[in-house]
Amino acid sequence: HNKIGSVGKKFPDTNIKISDDGEILLQGRHIMKGYYNNKKATEEALVDGWFLTGDVGKIDDDGFLYITGRKKEIYVSSAGKNIAPLVIEETMKSIPIVSQCFLVGDNRNYCTALFTLDVGVILRDKIGIEATIIPKDPLKQLKVLGENGFSLKDYTESDEIFNEVQDEVNKLNLKFSNPEQLKKFSILPRDFTIDDGELTPTLKIRRKQITENWTEVIDSMYK
């Protein structure tokens, strides 16, 4: 049987363990013996016969493996606690009106987040436009919002929307340990974009650029 959120159990003749820093390590004759004619890469990938996957995860009592993030994306709090931002971000993105979530917490004493709002959801749930006629393109969505007499600012700066998001954050925080819970958040005036360097062409978030672009907002959550 399977478990939701798990990638399953190990195959026969495969060993899996979690390193002290949370990385998933694999061992088995079928994994790999090394890189062809590249001793340096082999030494970096294989340690004492264990293949370093670069993924961070956990194994439950039934032997099911869960991948919680990439090692290079792991945050370390000021108290030394490892935090996997991707898991928290994806959980918070389940809030209907939220489009993007960016977790802040690396070398900080608590976690905060930057949220952007989903204009399509605003058009559907707040203005009452039929979902089937809402355009997919974000710029066209903003145009429709304007045609209905509103701007995105009416929602990003709304106390009502902030409280709505806060209620959802309070519920979702219960899924995480105290160091992983969001203590504060800010709703940004616009969504992340490729043009501003905040998203890759495949729409993955660029952490360094987002941190640079929104430094003042981030710093305000730690005062």
Residue ranges and their predicted role:
Residues V56, I95-V121:
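C-terminal boundary motif of the adenylate-forming
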Residues A45-L46, F64-K93, I122-E157, P179-E180, ...:
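Adenylate-forming
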Residues H1-N2, N15, V98-S99:
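Gly/Ser/Thr-rich phosphate-binding loop
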